[in-house]
């Protein structure tokens, strides 16, 4: 897979991937098969994904609430808050990448409206979020009542610097994400994962019981709860990260 070269010096300066291993690779794999065009990466983090995509011929712009974290050279950057108006013109982009961003937002509904505004007709939105609906997370919720580790006030101050923007404050599952996309005229065209989780196979008896139970559901109930998708290998058996690709119609 062709990518731009990231030097050791850049890595030492913090020019690193903040997403889980496999996420950027899957996004790049998808975009390599698409026509080159204008791309907005928001939130961009260090800018490493845009640096790689720029090396593949995409015309990239970067945006993030944290300007100090941006490390990429020769790529335009604007500071912006996804809870508010993203500072770019309407119908400007062929692609938007939003890697591990929505779960940090107080207002993901606003962000989705902004994505719709910024994309050209036929433009594609590539989103990654934590996969809270894989079988491992579902079992964790069953036994603990929480999808993630609870955050104490001490942890909030020491680990997250008392900033909500650093936390996962929206534990968004696939059904809500699908609703947000479709209510803004964005149709899902592909689901993917970062990488498989081998230890999922230890939960095979539970997986088999759930699938057998749902097999007896009436057709209308299966459709109403989107079981074809929520019990798919990408979601139910998926990795830590769910990648959703949608198109503006």
Tell me the role of every PLM-derived stretch:
Residues 7, 27-30, 93-95, 155-159, ...:
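A short alpha-helix capping/helix-coil boundary motif
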Residues 1-3, 59-61, 187-189, 246-249:
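Polar low-complexity intrinsically disordered regions
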Residues 1-34:
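Conserved class I S-adenosyl-L-methionine
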Residues 27-139, 242-248:
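Conserved SAM-binding loop
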Residues 14-18, 22, 48, 52, ...:
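S-adenosyl-L-methionine-dependent methyltransferase catalytic module, highlighting the catalytic core
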């Amino acid at each position: 897979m062709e990518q731009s070269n990231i030097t050791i010096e850049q890595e030492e300066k913090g020019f690193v991937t903040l997403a889980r291993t496999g996420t950027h690779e899957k996004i790049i794999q998808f975009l390599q098969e698409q026509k080159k065009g204008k791309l907005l990466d928001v939130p961009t983090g260090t800018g490493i994904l845009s640096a790689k995509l720029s090396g593949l011929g995409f015309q990239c712009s970067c945006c993030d609430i944290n300007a100090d974290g941006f490390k990429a050279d020769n790529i335009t950057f604007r500071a912006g808050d996804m809870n508010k108006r993203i500072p770019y013109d309407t119908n400007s982009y062929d692609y938007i990448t939003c890697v591990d961003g929505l779960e940090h937002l107080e207002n993901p509904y606003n962000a989705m409206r902004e994505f719709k505004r910024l994309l050209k007709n036929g433009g594609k939105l590539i989103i990654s979020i934590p996969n809270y609906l894989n079988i491992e997370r579902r079992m964790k919720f069953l036994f603990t009542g929480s999808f993630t580790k609870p955050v104490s006030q001490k942890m909030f101050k020491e680990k997250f610097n008392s900033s909500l923007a650093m936390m996962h404050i929206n534990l968004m599952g696939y059904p809500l994400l699908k609703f947000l996309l479709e209510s803004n005229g964005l149709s899902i065209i592909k689901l993917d994962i970062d990488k498989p989780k081998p230890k999922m196979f230890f939960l095979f008896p539970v997986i088999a019981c759930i699938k057998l139970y749902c097999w007896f559901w009436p057709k209308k109930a299966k459709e109403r709860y989107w079981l074809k998708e929520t019990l798919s290998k990408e979601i139910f058996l998926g990795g830590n990260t769910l990648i959703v690709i949608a198109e503006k119609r």
